[in-house]
């Protein structure tokens, strides 16, 4: 390729499997729209006294010729995972390269391999932003900044302590990413999520429990309730913001814990009002700023102090997303890390759609059966019995002899096992008896009554 800068030719052949990854990565960069003269292969730097030097695979510069991105290529899975563990341990090769190109804004660990079964190239990437997020530093001035780091070890400590070893797996080669604009601050339902399948349930449940154990979360009942709240937020988000998802962690380069929780609170308020008819108190950051309109011309310490008090009341008390008890900023950040892992577990999946999806119902049934203690007066009917009872109903006769959709009512619905089982059987019956392909009218005739708020919420969310 004319204009491509080649400093050495160790990777300009296919003698090693890793070289094929470099070739494929360069092809992607060119295909994306990066100019050849901005792509440099095997830039070499001296790594220290007595060191033989270091050689990165790919250096990408911006339009001004400044270093923008350093890419280290590895073979798929095993070598990639090892390199990523090394990076998390002490910075690995990636952070040693930053020391030589201090103006670099991003570093990336990249791997690719041909998948014979799908006839496509699978990729792995970990993109680390090494530029500061002003919002994160503003929220907590005590945190160290990349701008003040003087060496490799200090930069790694900033990444570890301030940005929590944050890395993203998208933001370089996706269709809605422009060249030279690395990272994403906007995610869309159709491009950044995939339909969830029932086969994901076991792995998802295992990951959920692993996160709880990792952070010593012992209140499983409470954790399940928070999970239901998160699902409610995600459903609202998919229905209301398909082109700019709020239920998505954008990475420390573009997001902060406070902004994330604020978005969740807003989605939760909308969901509780729309689906459960409950008015939830929600004070947005904009509401807080608006309360001080009279002080805009004369900002002072009093305003900052009142804002801090607002923040403590808003974020540190009575959260609907508490996996652990939050009473101050330390525990808020600790809880936010758990919350973040839960969100990242689900953000890439799509829960809503035109086709019936039994995932939520199956998931909640499994969680209730395995992780929630039944308190006095609450008894959950086992799923096989629900299936048997619903199957014993004369549904075919009722559907055939009623011109209007038949109504179904469970006046003590609990978590909605009977209702979801009934809803699952309806489509096949109406298609066979009345040649109706869309069961929406029949779904609107399904009702449940439950006095316990938590279970009513579970039943409502499971119905999606």
What are these regions (language model features)?
Residues 232, 239-369:
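Long recognition/docking surfaces used for binding and targeting
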Residues 163-249:
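Non-catalytic accessory regions of SAM-dependent methyltransferases
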């Amino acid at each position: 390729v004319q204009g491509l800068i080649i400093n050495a030719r160790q990777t300009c052949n296919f003698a090693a499997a890793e070289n094929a990854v470099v070739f494929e990565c360069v092809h992607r960069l060119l295909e994306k729209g990066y100019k050849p003269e901005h792509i440099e292969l095997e830039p070499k730097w001296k790594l220290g006294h007595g060191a033989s030097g270091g050689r990165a695979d790919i250096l990408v510069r911006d339009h001004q010729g400044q270093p923008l991105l350093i890419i280290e290529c590895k073979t798929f899975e095993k070598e990639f995972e090892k390199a990523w563990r090394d990076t998390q341990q002490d910075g690995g090769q990636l952070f040693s390269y930053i020391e030589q190109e201090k103006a670099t804004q991003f570093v990336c660990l990249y791997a690719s391999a041909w998948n014979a079964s799908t006839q496509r190239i699978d990729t792995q990437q970990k993109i680390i932003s090494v530029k500061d997020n002003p919002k994160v530093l503003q929220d907590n001035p005590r945190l160290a900044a990349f701008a003040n780091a003087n060496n490799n070890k200090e930069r790694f400590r900033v990444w570890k302590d301030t940005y929590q070893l944050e890395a993203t797996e998208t933001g370089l080669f996706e269709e809605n990413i422009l060249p030279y604009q690395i990272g994403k601050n906007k995610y869309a339902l159709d491009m950044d999520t995939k339909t969830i399948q029932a086969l994901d349930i076991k792995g998802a449940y295992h990951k959920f429990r692993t996160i709880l154990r990792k952070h010593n979360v012992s209140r499983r009942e409470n954790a399940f309730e928070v999970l239901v709240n998160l699902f409610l937020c995600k459903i609202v988000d998919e229905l209301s913001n398909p082109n700019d998802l709020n239920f998505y962690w954008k990475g420390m380069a573009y997001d902060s814990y406070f902004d994330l929780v604020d978005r969740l609170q807003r989605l939760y308020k909308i969901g509780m009002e729309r689906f459960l008819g409950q008015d939830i108190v929600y004070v947005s950051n904009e509401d807080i700023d608006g309360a001080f309109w009279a002080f805009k011309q004369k900002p002072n310490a009093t305003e900052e102090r009142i804002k801090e008090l607002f923040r403590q009341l808003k974020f540190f008390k009575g959260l609907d997303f508490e996996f652990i008890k939050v009473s101050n900023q330390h525990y808020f950040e600790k809880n936010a890390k758990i919350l973040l892992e839960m969100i990242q577990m689900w953000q890439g999946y799509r829960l809503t759609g035109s086709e019936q999806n039994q995932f939520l119902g199956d998931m909640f049934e499994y969680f209730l059966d395995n992780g929630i203690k039944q308190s006095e007066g609450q008894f959950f009917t086992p799923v096989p019995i629900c299936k048997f009872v619903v199957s014993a109903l004369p549904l075919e006769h009722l559907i055939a002899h009623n011109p209007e959709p038949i109504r179904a009512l469970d006046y003590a619905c609990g978590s909605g096992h009977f209702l979801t089982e009934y809803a699952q059987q309806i489509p096949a019956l109406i298609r066979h008896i009345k040649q109706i392909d869309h069961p929406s009218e029949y779904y609107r005739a399904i009702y449940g009554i439950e006095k316990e708020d938590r279970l009513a919420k579970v039943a409502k969310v499971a119905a999606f």
